[in-house]
Amino acid sequence: MSRYRGPRFKKIRRLGALPGLTSKRPRAGSDLRNQSRSGKKSQYRIRLEEKQKLRFHYGLTERQLLKYVRIAGKAKGSTGQVLLQLLEMRLDNTLFRLGMALTIPQARQLVNHGHILVNGRIVDIPSYRCKPRDIITVKDEQNSRTLVQNLLDSSAPEELPKHLTLHTFQYEGLVNQIIDRKCVGLKINELLVVEYYSRQT
């Protein structure tokens, strides 16, 4: 299944706020109206919608998300929390959380087009897994820095999650540590996502 490229407002009206997909927010009460029209949700639909929320927020294909679920299932600790850590530590999401892009698809374009360096080397793979002490910088070329500066100027000022530090004037971000669960930038019940996939096998 390919990455979603359709109307974004349609998705947030059904699933709620997806800051990684779009900065738009659903109108107050739209979730309640949708639920009243469709009646009581089944447990399957609740799990499916949480899975879809995760997939659309991080801009993943179904196959990519399933791969992350399997990796998380083999790791030590809570599968749901490990899954969120894996997704949050992706390079495209890290750029988004630093404020260097307004959405994750926008961050992915910056990476794909070679504007971003990690530890002094160009990394053009959006799924690159950032690690503590990684230094993320914008390529030292005018078009790259102008592009990112415009995005930084356009992004609403938000408190950075504790695992990241941004040095705006150097166009540099630092990964301090693996992200804590409470700093994840999406309202999600990750256990329902794990349950969804466990019932598919």
From Swiss-Prot:
UniProt-recorded name of the protein: Small ribosomal subunit protein uS4c
GO CC, one annotated term: small ribosomal subunit
Pfam families: Ribosomal_S4 (PF00163), S4 (PF01479)
Subcellular location(s) per record: Plastid, Chloroplast
Subunit annotation: Part of the 30S ribosomal subunit. Contacts protein S5. The interaction surface between S4 and S5 is involved in control of translational fidelity.
Gene Ontology BP annotations: ribosomal small subunit biogenesis; translation
UniProt similarity note: Belongs to the universal ribosomal protein uS4 family.
UniProt-recorded Gene Ontology molecular function terms: rRNA binding; structural constituent of ribosome
Domain S4 RNA-binding: from-to ranges: 89-152
Keywords: Chloroplast, Plastid, Ribonucleoprotein, Ribosomal protein, RNA-binding, rRNA-binding
PANTHER family according to UniProt: 30S 40S RIBOSOMAL PROTEIN, SMALL RIBOSOMAL SUBUNIT PROTEIN US4M
Region described as Disordered: 20-44
Function, in words: One of the primary rRNA binding proteins, it binds directly to 16S rRNA where it nucleates assembly of the body of the 30S subunit.
